[in-house]
Every structure is written in structure tokens, then in C-alpha cells.
Amino acid sequence: SDAEVMRFCQAFMTELYRHIGPDTDVPAGDIGTGAREIGYMFGQYKKIMNEYTGVLTGKSLSYGGSLARKEATGYGLCYFTNELLREHGMSFDGMTTVISGSGNVAIYACEKAQTLGAKVVALSDSNGYIYDRDGIKLDVVKQIKEVERGRISEYAKRVPGSVYTEGCSGIWSIKCDIALPCATQNEIC
């Protein structure tokens, strides 16, 4: 329940607050942790420390969070990659791109890569990956992942010509010009 999540977050911060701070370590939300949980932890930190400081990222706007926080990591990855490509006389434009993951980083990396002209053909989750040779329809992915909180396999049921494959590692065998690992740590061995 919401109350249990709140109590857990508050208890966690009661132990964590000594080890973090705006000049020490600034934790952020991660898989399964969003603005709600960060808000609970930030509220507890404020209560304990009597400070309203930048000690956690991923807060809601009402707690001083950033407007584009949700998009920041995925967009940043693409801006950084685009600069690397530019140094070598290339860009995302026309590049076939594979992206692992389908959370915030992957979804917004996909969005920005497409905006920069890439053709993103694959995304994954912890169960498998989708391949769409015509290019991922991001509106469908956002509906499944952000609204319905569903699995990426749903995409293949809704988009004709796309394919879902169980298991995640196969995504790296898809022929592409650019591969962006956005799922979790240690995914490329």
C-alpha cells in the first residue's frame, strides 16, 4: 500500500541521512523508484535535518525537482553520442539504432535519437526484446510502458510486422550502426 511504501522510505532515510548530502552523495531514483518514493525520502530528510537542500534527484517540481528530469538521462546520452559522432564526421541521421531497456533512459534516448534522425529498430525489457524493421513507434511504447505499466512484448501484439523475442541478450545480435545500452548495469559482457 502507499502507507507501507511511505513508511519504508522514511525508515530507509532515517538510516541513510548520515551518509548523504548536497556536498557528499546525492542519490537518485532507479528501477522501480520514482518521484513518489523520492518525495517520501526527501520529506523525511527535511524532517530530520531541518534543511531544504538538493540532497536527492528525481523529486517532483513541488519539492524543487527539475522540469525535464524524466528525459534528462536519455536525452543526455544522445547529445553526448551525437557529439562523438560529429567528431568523426557523422550524426544520428539515417543510422539504424538498437537500444536496450524500455524505462525512462531508453524511452527518452529513443525519442531523442529519432528526433536527431535515427531509425530505432529495437527496445527490450527484462523478459525479451522487440524488433521493428520499420522503426519503433514510440507512442505505442509510451502507452504500454508509461500508461499501462505493461511489458514490451505487448508492442508486437499491436504493431504488425514487429517481432518479440524472449531473452534479452539477443538484442545485441541485431545489425545496427549505433547500440545504446540503457537497461541496467553489467548488461554488456
Over which residues does each language-model region extend?
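Short catalytic-loop micro-motif centered on adjacent basic/acidic residues
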Residues: 27, 98, 178-181
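Glycine-/small-residue-rich active-site loops that bind phosphorylated ligands and cofactors
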Residues: 33, 105, 185
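Short, well-ordered alpha-helical microsegments
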Residues: 38, 106, 187-189
